[in-house]
Amino acid sequence: MKKQRNLRSMAAQAVEQVVEQGQSLSNILPPLQQKVSDKDKALLQELCFGVLRTLSQLDWLINKLMARPMTGKQRTVHYLIMVGLYQLLYTRIPPHAALAETVEGAIAIKRPQLKGLINGVLRQFQRQQEELLAKFNASDARYLHPSWLLKRLQKAYPEQWQSIVEANNQRPPMWLRVNRTHHSRDSWLALLDEAGMKGFPHADYPDAVRLETPAPVHALPGFEDGWVTVQDASAQGCMTWLAPQNSEHILDLCAAPGGKTTHILEVAPEAQVVAVDIDEQRLSRVYDNLKRLGMKATVKQGDGRYPSQWCGEQQFDRILLDAPCSATGVIRHHPDIKWLRRDRDIPELAQLQSEILDAIWPHLKSGGTLVYATCSVLPEENSLQIKAFLQRTADAELCETGAPEQPGKQNLPGAEEGDGFFYAKLIKK
């Protein structure tokens, strides 16, 4: 039996590592969840994700409730108070239980002398809640986004930025990809129905199903046998443009964690697929995905800027470049992105994308297809990137996705739809 741990202190320390040390929640959270009971895993995730989703609101409230911010070794207490405020604002946990557990968290982080302070701040919030929230709702902090990102969204989407921000602040729907080599989408939906769950097919992406209510993967019919994969609808859209065929040589560049690699093999089981990623650690997830789905691909560690180091002079019929990007289209899945990214990252990422595009283009056969994709909504990484590439690359031609003056297809995050995603389909003349 797992030792009873204080979830509030664990969540506070995880959020602190994201905000203060720049660590990714997807790296921090799984090892923490291994330390708690199954019934507590979901609550720990809810507290971490929720605090990061609403961080600017919680920060704003603490600044109003406390005369001085917590600094130095007491900084974790700042995040513990955030966890307390989040529970009072957004969960069904009874207030007395939320307060008691949060105050007890001070012992777990070895700050028992601050129990009174934590209790006092949270009770003060309860007394002033209505007045404080009225002021908060009139402030810029209400958008729950850093100011640099708000400015970029307002500039790029003067008519739509508010709906993008609103979608980013929602919990995401759970999209699945039915493995067409095992079942048709309709037959798998029937199995889902038999299991007491409801799903909805996507109108445009033939393998995509949205669950009415998110569910743990082990509850999904045939998950362990590779019948279905968790993948956002917009990510599945890459296959519409790539259109892989059997017997072709296909490169999936920046492939980890392998969702698109396995989708290529579901669409074209006899394709010769090479999956490459710079991050050796994340490549283990590509192997895991291939194993669960019973598929084979050549998996290599390599830098997209130097393809000759990992593929020599080899050329491919099709290349999927899911380029490293700001991930500003998937904030609802990864709310830590808002606080990990900086404005200065955007030109640096655009430069990296440009270098990879130029380096990999010679490895595409004449007449071949390259699909450039990002999970970003920022033009610098998307339409402007492809426009510049077309201008400097004489044998590149835009196909089916936009027009040369506004190249590519941009999906924006939507409440029941997929994430923010960009695609450009290029043909080598």
From Swiss-Prot:
InterPro entries: MeTrfase_RsmB-F_NOP2_cat, MeTrfase_RsmB-F_NOP2_dom, NusB-like_sf, NusB_RsmB_TIM44, RCMT, rRNA_ssu_MeTfrase_B, rRNA_ssu_MeTfrase_B_ent, RsmB-like_ferredoxin
UniProt entry keywords in alphabetical sequence: Cytoplasm, Methyltransferase, RNA-binding, rRNA processing, S-adenosyl-L-methionine, Transferase
Keyword Nucleotidyltransferase: no
Pfam families registered for this protein in UniProt: Methyltr_RsmB-F, NusB, RsmF-B_ferredox
Location(s), subcellular: Cytoplasm
PROSITE patterns from the UniProt entry: NOL1_NOP2_SUN, SAM_MT_RSMB_NOP
GO biological process: regulation of DNA-templated transcription; rRNA base methylation
UniProt-recorded Gene Ontology molecular function terms: RNA binding; rRNA (cytosine-C5-)-methyltransferase activity
EC class of the enzyme, as a word: transferase
EC number: 2.1.1.176
Active-site residue numbers: 375 (nucleophile)
Residues reported to bind S-adenosyl-L-methionine: 254-260, 277, 303, 322
Catalytic activity as recorded in UniProt: cytidine(967) in 16S rRNA + S-adenosyl-L-methionine = 5-methylcytidine(967) in 16S rRNA + S-adenosyl-L-homocysteine + H(+)
Keyword Plastid: no
SUPFAM superfamilies: NusB-like (SSF48013), S-adenosyl-L-methionine-dependent methyltransferases (SSF53335)
GO CC terms in record: cytosol
HAMAP family for the chain: 16SrRNA_methyltr_B (MF_01856)
Family: Belongs to the class I-like SAM-binding methyltransferase superfamily. RsmB/NOP family.
Chain's role: Specifically methylates the cytosine at position 967 (m5C967) of 16S rRNA.
PANTHER family, A to Z: NOL1_NOP2_SUN FAMILY PROTEIN _ ANTITERMINATION NUSB DOMAIN-CONTAINING PROTEIN (PTHR22807:SF61), NOP2 YEAST -RELATED NOL1/NOP2/FMU SUN DOMAIN-CONTAINING (PTHR22807)
Name by which UniProt lists this protein: Ribosomal RNA small subunit methyltransferase B
Originating organism: Shigella boydii serotype 18 (strain CDC 3083-94 / BS512)
